[in-house]
Amino acid sequence: MKCRIILGLSAILFFTGCYNREHISRLDEAEALLQNKPDSALTILKQLRREGSQAEQARYALLYSEALDKNHIKVTDDSLIRQAWSHYKHHPKDLRRQCKTLYYWGRVKLRAGDKPGALRLFLEIEEKLKDTNEPYYAGLLY
């Protein structure tokens, strides 16, 4: 009986680990395609489930928001990008993802007609980038 329990738990852990690696691999693939083939990235992201650790869910939310924006799909509901922010705001060392999250959140706010809200987010990015050399993100703002 004890052996069956151990065997069952081992199988669950094995298959969960395989799924997790596959999920992360698909997120990596979508991220790599975002700049030049955003439609392909969006297709991959639509095939994935919003599961995994909080970090994986936040990454998915950020990538999906970015893919929607790059495919010119107008989104005015900020619930998805706020999910990413609820994770990245606690990770100041991940400045790149913090800035991307704030940027795409600002883009959603602009589309929703909330220009002051968008401006606050863009100014927050500017403040975060003040002491760094991140020309890509500064370029997005201007």
Regions found by a protein language model. Give the residues of each.
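Bacterial N-terminal signal peptides
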Residues: G8-F14
